[in-house]
Curated annotation (Swiss-Prot):
Protein name: Nucleoside diphosphate kinase
Top-level taxonomic group: Bacteria
Record bears the keyword Amino-acid biosynthesis: no
Biological classification of the source: Bacteria, Bacillati, Bacillota, Bacilli, Bacillales
Gene name for this UniProt entry: ndk
Statement: the UniProt record of this protein carries the keyword Magnesium: yes
Quaternary organization: Homotetramer.
Binding annotation for ATP: K9, F57, R85, T91, R102, N112
Keyword terms: ATP-binding, Cytoplasm, Kinase, Magnesium, Metal-binding, Nucleotide metabolism, Nucleotide-binding, Phosphoprotein, Transferase
GO cellular component: cytoplasm
Location(s) in or outside the cell: Cytoplasm
Matches recorded under SUPFAM superfamilies: Nucleoside diphosphate kinase, NDK
Length: 139
């Protein structure tokens, strides 16, 4: 069965959207395997956004992601990577359709409530990155 990484970003946590987001995926029949709330380190945030390292907004992304707790999750189910991307909606809130998570809750391009892996390969990399970070916080 396919797995993906989903993360409720600091703005979604602050706004109390964790339950709403989890419910949407549970209602689709997907299985939540792992969930951890953690405030990301700068190193993990930089690794997460590595493909944007040379872009002018990279520092802003890292600063935002490390500004508070996030909810890191591993979800499993048939075609979950593709379906979760449809459920999440477009990155820019103005382009996100009503009924998608971003269409319903996102306010700006950077504060868009949720991250979801965009491919199976990205999911594997992100799950390894984020759950290694979580494990390092367990004493």
């Amino acid at each position: 069965m396919e797995k993906t990484f989903l993360m409720v970003k600091p703005d979604g946590v602050k706004r109390g959207l964790i339950g709403e987001i989890i419910s949407r995926f549970e209602n689709k029949g997907y299985t939540l395997n792992r969930l951890e709330m953690v405030t990301p380190s700068v190193e993990v945030a930089e690794a997460h956004y590595a493909e944007h390292k040379e872009k002018p907004f990279f520092g802003e992304l890292v600063e935002f992601l490390t500004s508070g707790p996030v909810v890191a999750m591993e979800w499993e189910g048939e075609d979950i990577v593709a379906v979760s991307r449809l459920m999440i909606g477009k990155t820019k809130p103005v382009d996100a359709q009503p009924g998608t998570i971003r269409g319903d809750f996102a306010s700006t391009m950077s504060q868009n409530v949720i991250h979801g892996s965009d491919s199976v390969d990205s999911a594997e990399r992100e799950l390894s990155l984020w759950f290694a970070e979580v494990a390092s916080h367990v004493s």
